[in-house]
């Protein structure tokens, strides 16, 4: 199952979203998930958008019904703090939002879908995908 990061949700709010991202969103049969952190980030972006911007309303009408929003709890907070402390000791400090998003994906065994693979490439055991890039071509194995 997939956990969609803020940049994917933001792309899906656009009037003309990236065709590859939209196609994956529309064709996915597994439940699509996001963190309450990501939902807050895109809602905040919509709130500070210029007057008359209707992207949030479009998102709520067209995209939100297809998403399950995962809440935070104490165990995710503990895991996020552990991850952030580990990353800081390795010289890769990240903000609390990224820590909570990574913890949510890791704890749930989810694939984090993000454009910012580099932000999460150091998280041990975390699987990521970038729907903005074409899928990697299958490599034939010799017989």
Q: Language-model features: where?
A:
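Short, well-structured N-terminal submotif of metal-dependent ribonuclease cores
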Residues: 1-34, 46-62, 135-142
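Generic structural signal for small/hydrophobic residues in well-ordered secondary structure
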Residues: 5-6, 42, 80, 105, ...
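Alpha-helix capping/helix-boundary segments
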Residues: 8-9, 38, 76, 100-101, ...
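Nucleotide phosphate-binding site architecture
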Residues: 9-10, 40-43, 121, 129
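Residues at the C-termini of beta-strands that transition into short coil/loop
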Residues: 36, 73, 116, 132-135
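Active-site neighborhoods of divalent-metal-dependent phosphate/nucleic-acid chemistry enzymes
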Residues: 68-115, 140-143
């Amino acid at each position: 199952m997939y956990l969609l990061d803020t940049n994917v949700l933001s792309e899906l709010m656009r009037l003309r979203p990236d065709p590859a991202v939209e196609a994956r969103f529309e064709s996915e049969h597994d439940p699509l998930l996001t963190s309450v952190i990501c939902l807050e980030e895109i809602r905040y972006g919509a709130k500070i958008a210029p007057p008359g911007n209707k992207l949030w309303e479009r998102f709520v009408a067209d995209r939100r019904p297809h998403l399950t929003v995962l809440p935070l709890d104490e165990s995710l907070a503990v895991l996020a703090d552990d991850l952030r402390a580990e990353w800081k000791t390795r010289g890769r400090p990240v903000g609390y939002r990224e820590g909570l998003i990574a913890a949510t994906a890791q704890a749930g065994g989810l694939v984090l879908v993000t454009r910012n693979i580099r932000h999460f490439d150091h998280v041990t055991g975390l699987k990521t995908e970038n729907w903005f890039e074409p899928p990697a071509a299958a490599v034939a194995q010799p017989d």
